[in-house]
Structure formats: structure tokens, C-alpha cells
């Protein structure tokens, strides 16, 4: 019985038929008429306003150790629904479309959390309504083993990120305290103490031990990496000889250029952003780096490319939302704000191919990639179209998407607020805080930095059939049932507050 939705305990029904709803209508028609009627009625009621869904395969659900992972999520998230699939996660498209929960957690064993699954989840979560954007906050929750995955699922205390460690340059002025070891300049690092300005320091020529110590002793809340990587290692230096982080069977170790070994053992809950690394999100077996980060380094949420990265929009752009707008977004929200930015760029600059889903390793698809007039005016090329298509579905998000990890409040270049301005009417106000510098790129390290649209998520889903911009249309806002997106204002950005007002209703 593929694609089952588990209804809340206590729902009545003959022979427990009302406890599940199947997406397989052929199977459904085989049920006695009375249970079918009751089944559909209770399913509709149960799915009216869902907040959280756990998606899991029948095989994983049948494994007691992994079922405890799913059960832990159900226990933590009130009213959570369980959707089960048999042969492919794509089977869950119909029940998710019927429910459209705010959060969807795909519980998967490492053997299931493949590159194919990541791509399938990206695509199916854009198909839940008529707009081209991702419709839910989703994450794939896995671990080196069920015990590791359970620890991730049980993490409930929100994480306020105060301490950051990085193997690449960051905007440290936006964080409370942190250290960056430069992957481009040997011997160069920057450190920020709480309450002080960032200061340049001399770093060791080989930073392997320093980075392991930053994890083991420094216990950062956020760890960031870039540079060359495979599923088995991270090459610390990008432009100069340096050591490695390597993984095997869930264990992580640093290995410097002299062959010295430094085991990683860092168990404080943290989030990890390998924003510029190839393959760090590709789980291809028990020795995968992603699993070692979860098992040996305390990672509760992370993103990661499942293929070699060459464009970078979907990775590096998360810094623009998460680190450079401190406190505004959770890590989940920052990931999906950047995803919305990418989809918007495709829809605006390359509308003829924006919804193509079969994409090659160099961003090729069945149709020729032609920039729109808007793209030509913005200096966007055919290569950008291929890069955006490639990046769209090749970055995984691992962890419970409802778990909140956000930076401690810090400097912001603009303020954005969403307020009720009347019955079923809302106003987004954007107030520049840095004058003419308010919307300039903060940090240029990496690839495809800056120029991101303003994204404001709504506290709850709105009725997509009752959305209308009533003022501020000159800013070309995009209004969906879960967020409003305002394109980056560019050089013509106002230096005083500006407003966008829209009508919207909550689902009845």
C-alpha cells in the first residue's frame, strides 16, 4: 500500500481503515464503501491545516531503530502527519499536495539519502501548487546510523549562533565572535572577539590543527568551509598547500601536510555551511563526509552540493541571507530564501527554460538557453542560465527543517517589517539603515555573491487564490502563499523607507 498517510491516534473506523489515506486510488477502491467514505472524510479533516509532515519509506518505518527517529519527530511536532512511500519518494507528491504542510521532514537511511533522492525532493516540493517556487520548508533527516539520526531528531532547543569558525573569508563584522582561516592567502586569518572589531592575525602555514582545535575546543555554533572536496575529504587550502579533513565510517580527522593526524570530536549542536565545496552533500556510502560531520562534529543542520560545483549561486548565496542579515532568518529560511532567489532569477532572466527539470552536469537541457531582454539589460549571459539550472536541484538540506538555528542579532543594512494594515491587508516596509550603502554587496568572497532579492516569509500560509498587490507594484514584487519577494533594488534603491501593500486571506 504505497503512499500512506498516518492519521492521528484515536480516529475511528472499521478495522482501523480510517487510520491511513492512500494515494493509490486503485487500492482505495478495493476497500469496503463505508470505510472509504469515512477514510476520505477523516483524511480531509486531518489534513486541513497541517504544520508538519514526516515522510518515510515503508522499509525504514518497519525498522524499529529508524522508526524511533520518525516517532521522535511526531512527538516533538504537535499534529504531525506521517506519509509513507514504498518504491520512490515521488509517490508522496499527491498527499503532500493535498496537505501542503509548512515543514516536511524526509527521514531516510544513508542508503536512501542519495543524490537521486535530493533531486526528487527538490522537484516534488515545487509541484505542490501552481507557482514555480518551493512550497514547503523541507529537510532530509539522516545520520551515520539510527542512533545518530535520533540525536538530530531529538534536538529541540533553538540555537542562537554566537561563535563562528570558518575555513574561508566571512563578513565577521556581522557575528558576535569568530575566526576565519583564509583558503586563498597562506598565513592569513581574521579573528573577532565579542564586542570588538575584526582583527587580522598571522595564521600557521598549515591550518589543519588550528581548524580541528576550533571545532574541538572552540565549540563553534556555525562552521563554514569552501575549496576542493570529495565525498571523502576536504582540501583546506585552495591556492596553497595545506592539510585535509578526511572521513571514514562516521569518524572525522584532520591530516596535515606532515602526515600528523588530529581526530575531530566536537559534540555541541551546530550548523554547517560547506558553501563552496564539491560533493560535501553527496552521501554515497558509510564513509561520506556528510555522515562524519553529523556523527563526529555535532552537526544538526547542513547543506551540501551533491555534484561538483562550478557556478555557486545556491551555495554561496546562503551567506547573503544567513550571515550577512544576522538574526533575520533561521538557517532553514536562509536556504529557501536563496532557493526562491534562484528560481526568481530563472523565471525572470530565462523564462523559456525556467521549468525544465532534466538538467545535465553543465546545466544543459532539452531547450536552448536564451536570455530574456531583462537578462541582457542586467549583463546576465547564457552561461548564467546554465549555471542556475545546474545549481537549482543539486544542493541538499539535511536536518529537521523546523529546528531553529539563527545568528545572534547583529548589524543590518536595512530593516524589513510585515504589519497588518487592515482586514486581510498587509504592508511590507523596507527601511534602509546604511544610506546609499544599504543594498550594496557586503562580502564578495566566493561566487555569485550579492544582488539577492529581499524575501519576507509569512508566519502562516495564505490563500493563493486571494493575493493581490495594491501598492508598490513599481518594485516588481512577487507574491506567493508563503512569502513576498522583492527584486534587489540596485543603484536606484530609495534611501528612505518604502512600502508594498497587498491583500491576502488565510485559508478558510
Model-derived features: where do they sit?
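N-terminal signal peptide c-region/cleavage motif recognized by signal peptidases
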Residues: 41-45
